[in-house]
Amino acid sequence: MITRIDYCNSVLYGLSVITLAPLQRVLHAAVRLVANLGYRDLLTPAMKELHWLSIAYRIKSKLCHIMHAAVNNRSPAYITDTLVPASCLLHRERLRSHESGGFEVPRVWTEFGRRAFSIAGPTVWNELPHNIRTTDNVTTSQ
C-alpha cells in the first residue's frame, strides 16, 4: 500500500530543500504523533526506530525502485524506452564505470531538465553501489 506521503513523490526530485520543507514538517508531525514525542524531543532516533526516511531519501528511494523495475523488465515500455544502458555507448566512449550495469545520463542544460526521469533515474541509479544495482530482489536493495 502506498502511503499518501509517498504518492507520486518521484516527481518532486530536484526540488529545493525549502520547497520540500512543508512536506518534511508533515512527516515530522506524524513521527511526533506515532512515537508520542514532544516538540523539543529529537526526531531522528524515533525515525530510525520506525524505519522511516526523510522526504529527500524517500524520493530517491522511489526513483531507485522504478529504476530497479526497469532494469528487471517489470516496468512499462514508456519507462524503459527512455533509458539507454551504458553498454550501448561507442567503444571509445566507454569507461570502466560504465561496465557495471549503469545507464547513460544524457546531457542537459537546464535545472528543470535535470528533474526529468530520463535524467534523474540514471543519475540516482549510477550513484548506487554495484552490489545493490545487480541484485534481483527488491527487499535486498532496500
PLM regions and their residue ranges:
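Hydrophobic/basic alpha-helical segments
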Residues: 1-142
